[in-house]
Design a protein with these regions (language model features):
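A solvent-exposed, acidic/Ser-Thr-rich amphipathic alpha-helical stretch
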Residues: 9, 22-76
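Short beta-strand edge/turn micro-motifs at domain boundaries
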Residues: 99-122
Length: 126
């Protein structure tokens, strides 16, 4: 039971910072694994710095986010996040992202995301 609370606390801290666009990276492991956003590249990006670059780009298009649902089972979790986006072309869209997490040794270790990539392609320049 202790591990479930720890994973939930890590996620709560991550999303609190993520919504503010600051302080979220403190709960990530240094060898953090991120998979998502490009179905043609299923291998994960490795490292907190590589993930930070992804989030720096992503932060330009999301205005707000909130956790819609969180299910935690030991070191595993699934979060449905609702994001409000404003794209460079002016389109404003609210959408959900499924986020599958793994924690290890008191840090968030891995994240795999699933979302509507076609909407992103249609609304962002190449």
């Amino acid at each position: 039971m202790e591990q479930t609370a720890t994973t939930k606390q890590l996620l709560e801290q991550y999303y609190s910072g993520f919504a503010r666009k600051e302080g979220w990276e403190t709960v990530l492991s240094d060898d953090f694994l991120f998979t998502g956003g490009d179905m043609t590249r299923p291998e994960p990006l490795v490292g907190k710095a590589a993930y930070r670059q992804v989030i720096d780009r992503f932060s330009r298009v999301f205005d707000a986010m909130r956790v819609k649902e969180m299910i935690v089972d030991g070191e595993n979790a699934c979060v449905i996040g609702t994001y409000d986006f404003t794209f460079p072309n002016g389109a404003r869209i609210t959408g959900d992202v499924a986020e599958i997490w793994k924690a290890r040794d008191g840090k968030l270790q891995a994240l795999t995301i699933f979302f509507d990539t076609l909407t992103f392609q249609k609304n962002t320049p190449a």
